[in-house]
Design a protein with these regions (language model features):
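Feature captures the catalytic ectodomains and active-site-proximal regions of enzymes
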Residues: 1-507
Length: 507
């Protein structure tokens, strides 16, 4: 019998793609992963669509993936939850949204913020359309849209099409005006790069930035200058569209991590990320979902559904020690999301945050990111033998995959493979069973069949390799099956709420 110590290694963005020149994982030299697949039991997991609580065919993402992995169940995600509310009409009766619109009806403006795409990772354009319609139906006269352009979860120059759709929809209803445009690089930072948030804030609150009353022309001008959607510099399209004291602001993003910093800048009196030239006081500000447990003063339109009896909670309840480790870009995923969307740190749960490199604007310039530091700390912690369960994330294949730069993505994959080799050696030395897997695909499709760049996640299956135990695995599973598998390896019974099924074949 094994000692019951288990380590889960999540290779973020490491999907199983077609064996072609557009697949950075296939093109990379991966002797460690190759040898693991030859030597140890392995299977494939679904990490997208209905299998992770997303709409059918919708690509998975890190938040969704880690929530499903850590909770051991398929978790109905915010995207279909909100989309279903639009379909059944309850969205338009939402009392939190309604209160913000009531405020705007009393002589104030309504500002709708959000990532303008159908990528479905942080937002969905149909949710923004629904909010414009709700404002129209309630007779709100001054409705301004502050659009963050995507180019990351969708094609890099698809933004012009989304802007055109929104522009036409507003014209058709006679409600809504695009006030500002900007790449998500600015308004949706999550790593305290406050200069980016400041540029975004100054466009929306102060009216500062490129001045262009025609949003379609602004997009064309950006493309002509070689700047794709994600990096479009803040553009002011409506001089009268500034966010002013007392206005209503609704942030339509449902994923918290990239909505948090802008929300702090717009709403918190003690905000100190940068010196605000103008502070819009007493905003009626609505978060579509819970962006941060500390933001207790802000109403939430779709509050979280509580998840109990997650993997971390069960392991802690058995008096066992666990470790969560990742670099900044994925730290929230192995802690907050893995624990079911709560900041709770369980008894016996240690956390290690390795800073992501901040001196580079994009990760194709540093494809190794902080993987070696993560690996070094992880190996040192494994060698203590102190932990019964370890969860580690290597961010590279996802974060470098998002840049669309193929040579850098190959370097990222190879760096992760080298790190994995040292982790496997340490785990074998200390008697740990390893589960090596991914939360979704990304680097497995860097180039589309037509030759264009892909910067988004994929819907491909992801690998799961069981290292250290010769146990037969089911032919295919889904991410929610990982937690019950780990509990079985640790000789712990899962709770009834954990509806995933162990991947280990019953003899």
């Amino acid at each position: 019998m094994s000692n019951g110590k288990v380590a889960l290694i999540i290779l973020d963005g490491y999907g199983i793609g077609e064996p072609n020149a557009g697949n950075a994982i296939y093109m990379a030299k991966t002797p460690v992963m190759d040898s693991l697949l030859q030597r140890w039991p392995h299977t494939k997991l679904s990490a997208s669509g209905l299998d992770v609580g997303l709409p059918d065919g919708q690509m998975g993402n890190s938040e969704v993936g880690h929530t499903n992995i850590g909770s051991g169940r398929v978790v109905f995600q915010d995207l279909p939850r909100i989309t279903n509310a639009i379909s059944d009409g309850s969205f338009f009766e939402n009392p939190v949204y309604g209160a913000a619109l009531d405020n705007a009806a009393n002589g104030k403006a309504l500002h709708i913020l959000g990532l303008l795409s159908d990528g479905g990772v942080h937002s969905h354009i149909q949710h923004i359309f629904a909010m414009v319609k709700m404002a129209h139906d309630r007779g709100i006269e001054r409705v301004y849209l502050h659009c963050f352009l995507d180019g990351r979860d969708v094609a890099p120059t698809s933004g012009a099409g989304y802007v055109s759709q929104l522009h036409d929809y507003c014209a058709e209803l006679g409600t809504g005006k695009i006030a500002t445009l900007q790449g998500r690089f600015y308004g949706m930072d999550r790593d305290k790069r406050w200069d980016r948030i400041e540029a975004s804030y100054n466009a929306m609150v102060c009216g500062e930035g490129v001045q262009d009353p025609d949003p379609i022309h602004a997009m064309e001008a950006s493309y002509a200058a070689g700047v794709t959607d994600e990096f479009v510099k803040p553009v002011v399209c409506a001089a009268d569209g500034k966010i002013r004291s007392g206005d209503s602001v609704i942030f339509m993003n449902f994923r918290p991590d990239r909505a948090r910093e802008m929300t702090y800048a717009l709403t918190q009196s003690d905000f100190d990320g940068f010196a605000r030239k103008v502070v819009a006081q007493d905003l009626h500000y609505v978060c579509t979902t819970r962006y941060d447990e500390k933001l207790t003063d802000l109403p939430i339109a779709f509050p979280p559904e509580e998840l109990h009896d997650t993997l971390g909670e069960i392991v802690s309840a058995h008096g066992l020690r666990q470790l969560r480790i990742a670099e900044t870009e994925k730290y929230a995923h192995v802690t907050f999301f893995f624990n079911g969307g709560t900041e709770t740190q369980y008894p016996g749960e240690d956390r290690v945050l390795i800073p992501s490199p901040r001196e580079f604007p994009t990760y194709d310039l540093v494809p190794e990111m902080s993987a070696v530091k993560v690996k070094d700390e992880l190996v040192a912690r494994i060698r203590t033998g102190a932990y019964d369960m370890i969860v580690c994330n290597f961010a590279n294949c996802d974060m470098v995959g998002h840049t669309g730069v193929m040579p850098a993505a190959i370097q990222a994959v190879e760096c992760v493979d080298r790190c994995l080799g040292e982790v496997v050696a340490a785990a074998e030395e200390m008697g740990y069973t390893l589960l090596v897997t991914a939360d979704h695909g990304n680097a497995d499709r860097m180039v589309e069949p037509d030759g264009s760049t892909n910067t988004a996640h994929t819907t491909n299956l992801v690998p799961l390799v069981l290292v250290g135990r010769e146990l037969p695995l089911r032919a295919q599973g889904r991410l929610s099956d990982i937690a019950p598998t780990m509990l079985e390896l640790m000789h712990i019974e899962p709770k009834p709420a954990m509806t995933g099924e162990s991947l280990i074949e019953k003899s």
